[in-house]
Amino acid sequence: PTAGSDPTTLGLFASIGIVKGQPFNPDERMKKILTDAANIGAVTARAIAFKIRSKEAYFYPDSAWRLPFFGGYKFEVSPGVSNLDGAAFYYYFATGVTPAMEEKMVGRGSQYPWSVQDAKGNPFDGGKNYKLRLPPNVPVKDFWSVIVYDNQTRSMVQTDQKAPSVSSQNKGVKTNADGSVDVYFGPKAPMGMENNWVQTIPGKGWFMILRLYGPLEPWFNKTWRPGEIVLQP
């Protein structure tokens, strides 16, 4: 229904032949324009998602940890002004959004820091091995998990593992003497660390999300922060 949108958006649709109650029959010229536009749009969103330049898109200075909501869950530069890069990135990268996924709600809601680059700024390579150290006392009321995604499909990577993740809910996850937890990524698990490992696929890129459920104050005030993901020899 026309009442479900605004005049500017409906005008943009009309300019390419999408009008309520009328058939959509683009000619060959318009089909090429629309195909090119879709490809350019996908490439642009991909570049914004995986190699954004704005420092405001990162949790910490000189870090690869990214904000999932660039411009808040409303994707705004300021009240009423859209953050177009933030929206393009997020809706290429994910689907739904609620305030509880972004706002400070100590002990409730969730947070989703994520990364697509190692400590030196290089993209993750499914044929190489990496390590993430989570310092002691991960600040969550409920649980945490590390999940790996295919950067082509943006869905969970499909491997021999039942789930491409390591979680505080999993049995057998090893903890270091100081209480920290090491999570490994790569085609094969380090010896004895199978329960702390997420399998990746040679020839495929990937990204990961650190999911924090019921995040606590040390997360929000940044007195606790995850280590950078380091390429292993």
Regions found by a protein language model. Give the residues of each.
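A compositional/structural signature for long, glycine/proline-rich flexible linkers
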Residues: 1-233
